[in-house]
Amino acid sequence: MKAPVRVAVTGAAGQIGYALLFRIASGEMLGKDQPVILQLLELSNEKAQAALKGVMMELEDCAFPLLAGMVGTDDAEVAFKDIDVALLVGARPRGPGMERKDLLLENAKIFTAQGAALNKVAKRDVKVLVVGNPANTNAYIAMKSAPDLNPKNFTAMLRLDHNRALSQLALKLGKPVGGIEKLVVWGNHSPTMYPDYRFATSDGASIGDAINDQEWNASTFIPTVGKRGAAIIEARGLSSAASAANAAIDHVRDWVLGSNGKWVTMGVPSDGSYGISEGVIFGFPVTTENGQYSLVKDLPIDDFSQKYIDKTLAELEEERSGVSHLLG
């Protein structure tokens, strides 16, 4: 049997955590032969800690053969001790009447502290995925707060946007989603992100040629993907927790086990490619192998695409400047 992998999940008793933990413990994220130890972080208030205890009881009651141990805590340094993978799900949600900049600052406090704790106690090759919104900027804050860790260890989740775009293309084409490859989602995990199917294929045939409808792209496809989260809240009365958890599992699984040459979207620190300012955590097409990701380079960017990329980059740079005074 392999040695267990230590996986930390923050916000572990929340909606996404609840949709996530049982799938991790069953082996869906790291493989059916890989034992895991779950290190679960929740807020220190009594209600959150009681809810966490209940989730841990349920995990015990599943008798997962791969679940080699659990820790439940309100202390980030306990949760992050010697971890291999961190899923930073917990974040301050936007309250009524709260400005986006206030939300940024509230979350900056959380992710500064969590970045520092990762820096202090996590394994040096820890893989960090930030799910809690605003995910790109929260990942940037955590990365900047962990100067002893490689910036490439920090990623933000764009996979939900990627999966949403895949399903919209499959519906439009009337084809199974599994045959679609080479989709890209550029930018921020926000309504400004840009789903780009110019290079995408369905069973090897160009999707751009098959759809050939720029009006549909601009007025239906891009806004549908961008506003999907809001549409789900309106329909369900709750945010998209199960699909977010599913995307987190996809992201980490591909990062750890490899994407088999397929393009996937990850929010990663820019190396300056495509004119994106260095260090900004931005959605890019990547391939993954042996636990490392590589950017897909040198894709042509037309004027239509450049306009969208510029817009989402401007939003990210504005977010970054809004928290830069906290990062020294």
UniProtKB/Swiss-Prot annotation:
It comes from the Bacteria. NAD(+) binds at G11, A12, A13, G14, Q15, I16, G17, N107, Q114, V131, G132, N133. It catalyses: (S)-malate + NAD(+) = oxaloacetate + NADH + H(+). GO terms for molecular function: L-malate dehydrogenase (NAD+) activity. The active site is at H189. SUPFAM superfamilies: LDH C-terminal domain-like, NAD(P)-binding Rossmann-fold domains. Gene3D superfamilies: Lactate dehydrogenase/glycoside hydrolase, family 4, C-terminal (3.90.110.10), NAD(P)-binding Rossmann-like Domain (3.40.50.720). Pfam families: Ldh_1_C, Ldh_1_N. Keywords: NAD, Oxidoreductase, Tricarboxylic acid cycle. One of its GO terms (biological process) is tricarboxylic acid cycle. InterPro entries: L-lactate/malate_DH, Lactate/malate_DH_C, Lactate/malate_DH_N, Lactate_DH/Glyco_Ohase_4_C, Malate_DH_type2, NAD(P)-bd_dom_sf. Coiled coil: none annotated. Its EC number is 1.1.1.37. The keyword NAD applies. Transmembrane segments: none annotated. NCBIfam families: MalateDH-SF1 (TIGR01759), PRK05442.1 (NF003916). Belongs to the LDH/MDH superfamily. MDH type 2 family. This is Malate dehydrogenase.
